[in-house]
């Protein structure tokens, strides 16, 4: 075993020196996140103090850095080894001691399967970071001009219709445009200030309001995404930071990967503008860019779990459709419940993500509460298994304080709140016991239980696919939601990638890529 804390940083620096780390790599930062994904801090000092009582003494390092006029962390490499050596030795000592304690937690919590999965995916992530993604800077220039031209045209239309050149990110400025047009808009409950969300723009049928939404999109893509890409290009490639799990620099509690510097997961979908943005990324020489995504990964996971939950009803027709071959979950639900596909998809995903009725109503664009309630009643009558599964997973989270994903990852519910309905500040068990009382408290956030189960299981499946691909010498360029983008050599390799991804973690219904 080779034991690190924040292994990605160390392993990449070692590789930069021309050396290779062989054997199984253990990252105590990753393991500490698997042991408890809800910690506030994951730095070595914080985690080690909790589990070992040991901590760093950085006084000598800070003193030396002050004398040399450098930042003790960011510019440590500028200090002579005599000043850094003792600090590094202590780091190694603490990391080893931490690993000895974390091994006990792995055994107590039965985390061997998920720890192994995260250890096995790590070499793939290192290669992804090291290799980077090729970027066409010429295409970035072309896109910036196109986005600016579209933005200018939108502002011109708005001014022609209202005489106002709006500040598109200022709600008060947009409100003036709407007032001039006689268009109603939402206001915040607390202050009554104008409120404009993505959903409110999507609901509007006014062409001028839609121009504001388009201008916002163009501005964000140009000044946030493309600007960020340009800043991080090095020798024609970008080498984003990849966050394997929750940590101090980013990451998710469900196990899904995240990116920073830049955040490649801000890539738009496959709309025309999205395809334009994606065109800045180019494959290796002689290859084609391949996008391999799990078809409706989350709905398939919902059906898989529903099939394995006692007492769940109304699955027959949907399972039959999947077993016949390709199936569109949202369309099947729409047909069964006599809804439009858009309505069915909005309700499906809203319930999977733990949305309440008020938010779902807003997503559906329905102003009348009675109408929204009737629509949801119609949905639940036709497809009762969704509500039944949500309740089953919530009950398990409430009863056990945690749920477990396909790959053995725990999602924990360690905060507490009063049993009575209302808005409450989540508390630790000790705080809740004192302020609320044992008989009057329940676990908080269990309404998110199904979402965490789905997201965590999707992460397990995608990471297992990446492990299996890496064993075949295939290194993904980008991992994005339920998609792997890969530089593909030929059709034979493309078919191989599809089969590897489909078979990564079998479900009780057919998977599709």
Model-derived regions: residue spans:
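Conserved "right-hand" nucleotidyltransferase catalytic core of DNA-directed polymerases
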Residues: 22, 39, 49-275, 282, ...
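A common structural junction motif
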Residues: 383, 499-509
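Metal-dependent catalytic core segments for phosphate chemistry
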Residues: 298-336, 421-440
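Helix N-cap motif at beta-to-alpha junctions
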Residues: 489-493
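Short glycine-rich phosphate-binding loop at a beta-alpha junction
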Residues: 1-6, 165-167, 293, 359, ...
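Glycine- and acidic
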Residues: 28-29, 76-84, 133-141, 280-289, ...
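Conserved RNase H-like, two-metal-ion catalytic cores of nucleic-acid enzymes
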Residues: 1-46, 50, 148, 303, ...
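Conserved pre-motif C helix in the palm subdomain of viral-like polymerases
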Residues: 90-96, 295, 447-470
């Amino acid at each position: 075993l080779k034991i690190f804390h924040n292994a990605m940083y160390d392993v990449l620096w070692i590789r930069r020196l021309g050396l290779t780390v062989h054997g199984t790599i253990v990252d105590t930062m990753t393991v500490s996140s698997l042991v408890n994904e809800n910690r506030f801090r994951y730095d070595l000092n914080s985690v080690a103090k909790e589990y070992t009582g040991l901590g760093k003494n950085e006084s000598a390092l800070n003193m030396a850095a002050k004398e040399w006029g450098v930042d003790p962390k960011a510019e440590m490499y500028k200090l002579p080894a005599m000043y850094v050596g003792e600090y590094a030795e202590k780091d190694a000592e603490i990391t080893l001691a931490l690993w000895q304690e974390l091994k006990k937690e792995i055994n107590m919590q039965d985390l061997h399967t998920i720890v192994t999965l995260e250890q096995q995916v790590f070499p793939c992530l290192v290669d992804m970071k090291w290799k980077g993604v090729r970027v066409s800077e010429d295409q970035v220039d072309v896109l910036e001009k196109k986005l600016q031209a579209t933005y200018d045209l939108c502002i011109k239309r708005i001014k022609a219709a209202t005489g106002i050149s709006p500040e598109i990110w200022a709600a008060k400025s947009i409100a003036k445009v709407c007032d001039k047009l006689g268009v109603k808009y939402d206001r915040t409950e607390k202050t009554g200030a104008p409120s404009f969300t993505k959903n409110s723009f999507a609901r509007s049928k006014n062409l001028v309001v839609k121009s504001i939404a388009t201008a916002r999109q163009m501005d964000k893509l140009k000044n946030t995404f493309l600007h960020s890409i340009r800043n991080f290009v090095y020798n024609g490639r970008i080498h984003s930071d990849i966050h394997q799990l929750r940590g101090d620099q980013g990451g998710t509690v469900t196990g899904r990967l995240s990116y920073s510097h830049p955040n490649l997961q801000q890539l738009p979908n496959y709309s025309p503008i999205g395809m334009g943005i994606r065109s800045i990324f180019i494959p290796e020489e002689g290859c084609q860019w391949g996008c391999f995504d799990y078809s409706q990964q989350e709905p398939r996971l919902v059906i898989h779990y529903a099939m394995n939950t006692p007492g769940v009803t109304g699955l027959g027709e949907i399972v039959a459709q999947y077993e016949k071959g390709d199936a569109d979950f949202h369309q099947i639900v729409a047909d069964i419940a006599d809804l439009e596909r858009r309505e069915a998809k909005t309700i499906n995903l809203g319930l999977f993500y733990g949305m309440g009725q008020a938010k779902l109503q807003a997503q559906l664009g329905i102003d009348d509460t009675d109408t929204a309630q009737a629509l949801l009643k119609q949905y639940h009558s036709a497809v009762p298994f969704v509500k039944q599964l949500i309740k089953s997973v919530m009950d398990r989270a409430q009863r056990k304080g945690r749920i477990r994903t396909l790959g053995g990852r725990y999602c924990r519910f360690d905060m507490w709140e009063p049993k009575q309905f209302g808005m409450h500040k989540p508390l630790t068990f000790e705080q809740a016991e004192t302020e609320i009382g044992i008989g009057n408290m329940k676990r908080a956030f269990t309404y998110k239980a199904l979402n965490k189960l789905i997201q965590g299981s999707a992460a397990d499946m995608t990471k297992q696919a990446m492990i299996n691909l890496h064993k075949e010498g295939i290194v993904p360029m980008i991992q994005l939601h339920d998609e792997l983008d890969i530089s593909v050599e030929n059709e034979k390799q493309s078919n191989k990638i599809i089969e590897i991804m489909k078979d990564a973690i079998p479900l009780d219904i057919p998977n599709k890529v």
